[in-house]
Amino acid sequence: MTELLARQLEKTAGITMTGVTFRGTGPAVQEIAAGRLDFMVGPLAVTIPLHEAKKVKIIGMTSPERLPVAPDVPTLKEQGTDIVNYGWWGVCAASGTPRPILETLNKHVAAAVASADFKSVIEKTGVIPVSSSIDEFAAIIADTAKEAGAMIKELGIEQLD
């Protein structure tokens, strides 16, 4: 999604950016912190520590509202764009895993997410911990795929062979 969000920002701002492909967020964050990369779209979980250390400046968030972990950072919507998007993390199992096993796994994940210890750690990264049912999570995945497909179509991105 970060590539799609960068392209959406490029279109909204009416600018042209040169994309640089990295093997994951880690190398990109290292390059921006070292001053060899001018701009990136990335997850708060890895950029907040650098923002707090004044090694990078987060100029906007795609979340619907400002987040407690970075109250000084405005949303892109506050800055006049229609860009609102937030990522999610989930626990997945192999296709064909029996439903009772999925339900047991989901129950334990929900308990972990609700724990004070987990919340105290994860909220420092800008993540708002929530849990969902198996079916709710399946709907989130489907909705995300639908939104990404619409963005790809809107931005005129063609499939590479």
Give short role names for the model-derived ranges.
Residues M1-D161:
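Conserved, function-defining micro-sites of small-solute handling proteins
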